[in-house]
Amino acid sequence: DLARREADIAVRGIPKHKRPPKDIVGIKLGRISLGYYVHKELLSEASRSQRELTCIRASGRALSLGDLPDPESLGLKSRHLIDGITPRTVAVTNKLGVAALPCFLAKQYPDLMLLPGVPSAHWGYVWLLHHKDLRQSARIRALFKHLSALEEKWPNCWDTSLDNARRAA
């Protein structure tokens, strides 16, 4: 917790419509996109009517879907409520259902794929943050200067949304 001075810096994903708190200073490092991911075997079983595709949801407090459609509009029943990116990822990799996951995380699991017909969507940004009282710290300034210079080289895998693909073209 930066506000309580439990750390000098923090890396956070913040939705695109929000900003860091007033007493926290930061820079955007890159864009994050979300997508509905499913295990390839579960999708195959569902296409053969052997299993039903259901959605693993997060509570509204834990995850905003951003521009992704609601699971119900995709015909997915919500069967499980799991807060936390890591537990939801584990659930999807174990074929429990479909879940909205950050693309940079899901890409690390070759058995996961985007739900067909539902493109990923820009969700927010990765921010590097520090408390405003550390603005004069030489090591904080040096780190932020170095990382902001790398911004153009930041991984595109964090944002696989269509608008990012259009910008790159």
Predicted regions and their residues:
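Residue-level signal for short, function-critical loop segments
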Residues: 40, 132-134
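Hydrophobic alpha-helical segments, especially transmembrane helices
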Residues: 13, 89, 140-142
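C-terminal regulatory
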Residues: 4, 16-126, 152-169
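Short hydrophobic/aromatic beta-strand micro-patches
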Residues: 129
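Pocket-flanking alpha-helical
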Residues: 6-14
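Short amphipathic alpha-helical coupling segments at ligand-binding clamshell hinges
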Residues: 135-149, 154
